[in-house]
């Protein structure tokens, strides 16, 4: 199991780190995990995500900046037993268009296991529920949702450093809108900019906040 130290983190929202630092050590069957969200597709955005696991329930807190403003940003937790458990790199660009699509990233991070919607279902079936994701006012995303039910396998993957947080939505042509990149590989009625990954990070257990 990989671990990360709370003191080594930087976050766009200092409150996230403060809350984590003041939290008591995790008890058996629970863990606090953290991911530094870094750019994919040369997108100028970054962020932090924390996922608290208690049994088969999770609480997700996420902050990011530099996203396409006032546009929906689908966000998910990904996991696949056969995946590399990491964020994609340009070598995953199999069609040679110099962009990494969501599908091209699957060998790295696996399929969607949790949809980080603002309300309603959070299952993989909501992966493209564009009307239920954060819209990043002024390019900033602030997200918190608790009580999300996951399977034992997904909870274990999060605690074991095998789950990946991905936020989608990029702006290749700098128009502040989703209108380029061709059709999405997930839904041809959407432009690729709407669904290509923007930022990504692997969830690792924070020192002193993990247990089984």
Q: What residues fall within each predicted segment?
A:
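N-terminal leader/targeting pre-sequences
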Residues: 2-7, 12-19, 24-212
